[in-house]
Amino acid sequence: AFAGVLADADIKAALAGCAAADSFNYKTFFKSPEEVKKFFAIIDQDHSGFIEEEELKLFLQTFSAGARALSDAETKIGVDEFATMVKX
């Protein structure tokens, strides 16, 4: 799903950069608002306009088998909330 969007080196750097809770630096990872929307669309597999909990779990497991568990109690986020979360 990330072919043409992320290079292998970028994926490895992102995984290394977010190994600990609250350590992912989104300000340097996403290069533009369009890129944020691309990532959202990839994760939102049912195209509902929201990333539900199961979609996020599936994405994290696909992205990295060793991905840490989410600590947020919310069960879905919309594209605007996702963009705000990764930009702010």
From Swiss-Prot:
The modification N-acetylalanine is found at A1. The keyword Ubl conjugation does not apply. Ca(2+) 2 binds at E81. One of its GO terms (molecular function) is calcium ion binding. Ca(2+) 1 binds at D44, D46, S48, F50, E52, E55. It comes from the Eukaryota. SUPFAM superfamilies: EF-hand (SSF47473). Disulfide bonds: none annotated. Residues 31-66 form the EF-hand domain. PROSITE patterns: EF_HAND_1, EF_HAND_2. PANTHER family: PARVALBUMIN, PARVALBUMIN ALPHA. In muscle, parvalbumin is thought to be involved in relaxation after contraction. It binds two calcium ions. Is regarded as an important allergen. This is Parvalbumin beta 3. It comes from Merluccius productus. The lineage of its organism: Eukaryota, Metazoa, Chordata, Craniata, Vertebrata.
